[in-house]
Amino acid sequence: MAFIISIIIAYLLGSLSFAVIVAKLMKLPDPRTTGSGNAGATNMLRVGGRQAAFYVLLGDAAKGLIAVLIARFLNVQGVSLAFVGLVAVLGHLFPVYFKFRGGKGVATMMGVLLGLSFWIALFVIATWVIVVSIFRYSSVAALVSAVAAPIYTIIAGRTDYLFPVLIIAILLIWKHWENFQRLRKGTEDKVKL
């Protein structure tokens, strides 16, 4: 029963689109219809600046972390705990409150990983920061981080988390597919940090 309750909470928390919420609170354009059209922190950086992007990043990561922490509190463990994190990411990608139009899941994945394992999260976040600092493309950083997450999970010895983390990575790569096509064509926007 604790697992089912955790799954429901994770999806409902994941469905909170902080890009849309922050845009409304700060009287900014809807990120789903402005910039890249993505309800995420990188697009909010373009649409509303650093402060708006920071709030979105914090909110999107926090909901993933909180979903996993609630499940931990309810004594959900191992692969079941990682599946709760996956559902939080699915909520972000397909939010019930916002007609199933969500973001791409990078910040939420990082929050989920932080709830699962501090060290895995630390290495994934460090990977994202290093890659975006070098290449200035959020999508490249997302790709490398998504590929790295299952690898770091194996290195950390948390093979019980591996399958859900692998699914999260595949979902993130799929959600960034258009970005990768723009990268190939040379039309992808760089991130201005």
Curated annotation (Swiss-Prot):
Tell me what gene encodes this. plsY
Which reactions does this protein catalyse? an acyl phosphate + sn-glycerol 3-phosphate = a 1-acyl-sn-glycero-3-phosphate + phosphate
Q: Name one GO biological process term.
A: phospholipid biosynthetic process
Keyword Transferase recorded: yes
GO MF annotations in UniProt: acyl-phosphate glycerol-3-phosphate acyltransferase activity
Query: Quaternary state and partners of this protein?
Result: Probably interacts with PlsX.
- What is this protein called in UniProt? Glycerol-3-phosphate acyltransferase
User: Which top class of enzyme applies to this chain?
Assistant: transferase
What family is this?
Belongs to the PlsY family.
Pfam families, per database record: G3P_acyltransf
Q: Where in the cell is it found?
A: Cell inner membrane
The record ties this protein, via PANTHER family, to: GLYCEROL-3-PHOSPHATE ACYLTRANSFERASE-RELATED, INNER MEMBRANE PROTEIN YGIH
The record ties this protein, via HAMAP family, to: PlsY
The cellular component terms of Gene Ontology attached to this UniProt record, alphabetical and capped at eight, are: plasma membrane
Highest taxon of the lineage: Bacteria
**Membrane topology listed for this record:** Multi-pass membrane protein
